[in-house]
């Protein structure tokens, strides 16, 4: 069903579009619900290319995001730096919003400005529950970004080796990550773990057949 079929404007009044984005920033659900049936366009963008849902997602305004998503906001609409509500929620560990985007058509193959899926920054930033959620959703485990790194490599190279990163490495291995997929310089996940003294991660990789 299109937005026009729902009674939402196809282009929108600029003043009301601005008001909708402001309401999203303030987590003002009542105002969002007041604006949408009138002349606000749900996916109208500001100068940064951000929709109201993108703004709500950045602020982790769960109620505003829910109202917008339920009204048909595009969870894959990218801003000027190639972030979408889905990708941003995954990268930042905004789990509740991420789950809503997954339930409303998130494009699992979409990538950010670094050519990475949502799983890669989630792993790099230590968001354990987010990694679990994205794996369960079916995001490609061994996707390689523009830097030549996978989620497994980023969890090791850019993490600190503590418990949350140990858990993420375990989750990725259990999901079938290629433990021998090296970076562009030919350095393997095992070599990166050894170089950083991450013994627990090293042992997990060895147990999974890393070389």
Which role fits each region the language model picked out?
Residues 4-5:
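C-terminal motif of bacterial Sec signal peptides marking the signal peptidase cleavage site
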Residues 22-27, 55-61, 88-94, 121-127, ...:
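Ankyrin repeat A-helix N-terminal signature
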Residues 180-211:
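Leucine-rich solenoid repeat scaffolds
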């Amino acid at each position: 069903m299109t937005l026009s079929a729902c009674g939402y404007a196809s282009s929108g009044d600029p003043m009301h579009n601005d008001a909708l984005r402001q309401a999203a920033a303030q987590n003002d659900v009542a105002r969002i619900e007041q604006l949408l049936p009138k002349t606000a366009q749900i996916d109208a963008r500001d100068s940064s290319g951000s929709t109201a849902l993108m703004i709500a997602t950045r602020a982790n305004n769960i109620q505003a995001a829910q109202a917008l998503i339920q009204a048909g906001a595009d969870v894959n609409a990218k801003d000027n730096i190639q972030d979408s509500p889905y990708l941003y929620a995954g990268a930042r560990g905004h789990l509740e919003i991420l789950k809503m985007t997954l339930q409303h058509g998130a494009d699992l193959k979409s990538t950010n400005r670094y050519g990475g899926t949502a799983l890669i920054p989630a792993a790099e930033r230590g968001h354990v529950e987010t990694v679990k959620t994205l794996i369960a959703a079916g995001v490609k485990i061994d996707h390689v970004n523009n830097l030549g790194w996978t989620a497994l490599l980023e969890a090791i190279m850019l993490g600190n080796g503590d418990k949350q990163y140990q858990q993420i490495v375990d989750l990725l291995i259990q999901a079938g990550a290629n433990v021998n997929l090296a970076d562009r310089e030919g350095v393997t996940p095992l070599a990166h773990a050894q170089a950083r003294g991450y013994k627990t991660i090293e042992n997990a990789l060895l147990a999974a057949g890393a070389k």
